[in-house]
Amino acid sequence: MKKNWMLVPALLCTFGAAQAHQIWLEESSQGGAVVRFGEFGENLREASPGLLDKFGKPAATLVSAKGDTSADGKKQADGFALPFKAQKGESIVAEDARYPLYSWGEGDKQTRSWFYPAARQITDFSAQKPKLTLDLLPTGTPGELQLVYQGKPLPKTKVTLTVQSGWMKQAQTDEQGRVTFEMPWSGTYVAEASHEDRTGGERKDPDGAGKYDIVYYVTTLTYVKPDGIEPVPAGPAASPNK
């Protein structure tokens, strides 16, 4: 099985590991859901103290037929714990809308950027409605996802599917924002997509420095497949960045 890894090259070169990462949702050893920050395919989970401290307070929502339940993540050593987990037929969405703005460039040519990470966890492929600005959704067909931006399908965009061993496969969304992956192994799959919005604008920050030129959205979808071929184990845990 080929092992690969994917980063956002421009962000990695300019800003280092923090902006090249993703967040994803998974079940913790304590049984509840947890928001991770790092690289799933590299078995990298950032920690506190360290890059995990970049986050303010990721917000999450349990989406259920009984109604939605929202809560802020509680920071722990290796992620943000949530007071709920997704049961069969439910899902969880999470995002950090206040990740610190950052600047890059030279001299007077500075670009102010906003990294906007988000995540969804599903328990099956029942069709769901968008909840996140950039959202990967199950369509009702096993293995099929739809990428939606601001409530509308996002066509011709790369989606990457990764398993715990680091193996990954990429595909491009069609005109309806849909993409299909085969999932032969049991275990955890994390799909990721990104989108850059150069409209610019201003957000309300405590320090007042809320103007930005670019928003870089990164969103993931986690699904744990209960059956299939025995998966290759994850490699050794990568050391968190300081």
For every predicted segment, state its role.
Residues 90-97, 188-196:
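A short, solvent-exposed beta-strand micro-motif common in secreted/extracellular proteins
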Residues 1-6:
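Bacterial N-terminal signal peptides that target proteins for export
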Residues 58-68, 157-171:
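Short amphipathic beta-strand segments in non-cytosolic proteins
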Residues 31-44, 137-149:
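Beta-strand-rich structural segments
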Residues 63-110:
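Mid-chain, structured segments of secreted extracytoplasmic proteins
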Residues 14-17:
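N-terminal signal peptide c-region/cleavage motif recognized by signal peptidases
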Residues 21-32, 106-143, 201-242:
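Beta-strand-rich domain onsets/edges
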Residues 76-82, 173-187:
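Glycine-centered loop-to-beta-strand initiation motif
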